[in-house]
From Swiss-Prot:
InterPro entries: Ribosomal_bL28, Ribosomal_bL28/bL31-like_sf, Ribosomal_bL28_bact-type, Ribosomal_bL28_sf. The keyword Cytoplasm does not apply. The lineage of its organism: Bacteria, Pseudomonadati, Pseudomonadota, Gammaproteobacteria, Methylococcales. This is Large ribosomal subunit protein bL28. It comes from Methylococcus capsulatus (strain ATCC 33009 / NCIMB 11132 / Bath). GO terms for biological process: translation.
Amino acid sequence: MSKVCQVTGKRRIVGHNVSHANNKTKRLFNPNLHERRFWVESENRWVRLKVSNHGLRVIDKCGIDAVLADIRKRGERV
């Protein structure tokens, strides 16, 4: 599975490692992803999502039902 947050859409970005001598080499910055299960009361089932730490905070703020509706509106299957 890809390294993309299902809630916020955060994904890997490209940057540089910078040495003390200021040499730069390409590297990847990965989002802080976690595979989490959420209980959805309205559907009476568990939903498994790959979310970043920011995505977890969005779920805490808006609620899992609103977040799932947003994900489904984008066309993702949950």
